[in-house]
Amino acid sequence: MYSADPIIYVVHDFLSKDECEEFINIAKKIGQEDINIYRVNHDASNLLHETSKRLSILVQTPIRNAEKYLVTTFNEQTITTETIDSLNPETQSKLMEKDSGGQRLLSLMGALSEKDRLEVTFSELDLNIKLQTGEILVLHNCYEGSISPNPKSKYTIRATNKTVSWYLKLIFRERLIK
């Protein structure tokens, strides 16, 4: 565990080499969507369906509460900005409506490319976490037991090498996404 407020921990060797390659291959088949972000269904293949179930068990939240996987490519030159995945109830209430699953409670992140390392920086915590291929970082976006965003959950993610890196993110909502 790296932090208790917000809860941040890393699970080593969670994704197999085959699972990492499957995410990359399916994203490549989808083609370019939003510059370098590919939205991948939880059941895009039998292997990813099983991976989705394992991730759901890891965070003890139904996979039906999760948004689609975001598989992203970037390199050392990619300009990244500070991100907070939780939704602000005052300004983003439409995104929190019943059908959209409510608040974004958990974010899972991982490096997919062989020999890649991703660095996740939490500026509010003065914390840098380097993720290796197959590792999963789990971040609780809200205060414990609430849907109020924790401002300390802001992060920046970047590649630590010059080649194209593949990165995975999965966000779990508070309720079923319809």
For each predicted feature, which ranges?
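Fe(II)/2-oxoglutarate oxygenase catalytic core
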Residues: M1-L137, C142-K178
